[in-house]
Amino acid sequence: MEIVKVCPEIHVVMDIDSGLIAEMRKDILVVDLHPVEEQINKLAYFAKALENSLDPRNAPMKSYKGRDGTYKTGGLFQGMFFGFWVTMSILVLVTILTIKMNLSLIGL
C-alpha cells in the first residue's frame, strides 16, 4: 500500500491503490508487506517441493524434464542394494554355522 502526502501541513494523505483521501493519524502505522509476501510465497514454493519429494512419482524440484519417478527408481535400487548385502551376510553366517556343526564337511 503506497500513500502520497497531499498536504503535509494538515496531514492529508491519499492511498494510491484505492484513490481514498483521508487524514493521516499518528497512532496508525502503515507498513509495506509486499517483501514479506514475496518471502512467504517463496517459502510456500519450497514447502510444496518438499511435500512433492515425499511422493515417489514426482520429479525433484531442480531437475531436467522427463525425470519423473527418480525417487521411485532410487528407492528400488536402494532396496536391492541393502537386500543383497543382508542376504550375503545371512548366507555367510549360515555357512559358518553349518561348518562348525558338521566338521566332516571340510574333512576334519
From Swiss-Prot:
Keywords: Cell membrane, Membrane, Methanogenesis, Methyltransferase, One-carbon metabolism, Transferase, Translocase, Transmembrane, Transmembrane helix. Its EC number is 7.2.1.4. It holds the Pfam family MtrB. It is a single-pass membrane protein. One of its GO terms (biological process) is methylation. InterPro entries: MtrB_MeTrfase. GO terms for cellular component: plasma membrane. The chain crosses the membrane at residues 79-99. One of its GO terms (molecular function) is tetrahydromethanopterin S-methyltransferase activity. The keyword Isomerase does not apply. Pathway: One-carbon metabolism; methanogenesis from CO(2); methyl-coenzyme M from 5,10-methylene-5,6,7,8-tetrahydromethanopterin: step 2/2. It comes from the Archaea. It is found in: Cell membrane. Part of a complex that catalyzes the formation of methyl-coenzyme M and tetrahydromethanopterin from coenzyme M and methyl-tetrahydromethanopterin. This is an energy-conserving, sodium-ion translocating step. The complex is composed of 8 subunits; MtrA, MtrB, MtrC, MtrD, MtrE, MtrF, MtrG and MtrH. Belongs to the MtrB family. This is Tetrahydromethanopterin S-methyltransferase subunit B. It comes from Methanococcus vannielii (strain ATCC 35089 / DSM 1224 / JCM 13029 / OCM 148 / SB). The lineage of its organism: Archaea, Methanobacteriati, Methanobacteriota, Methanomada group, Methanococci. The gene is mtrB.
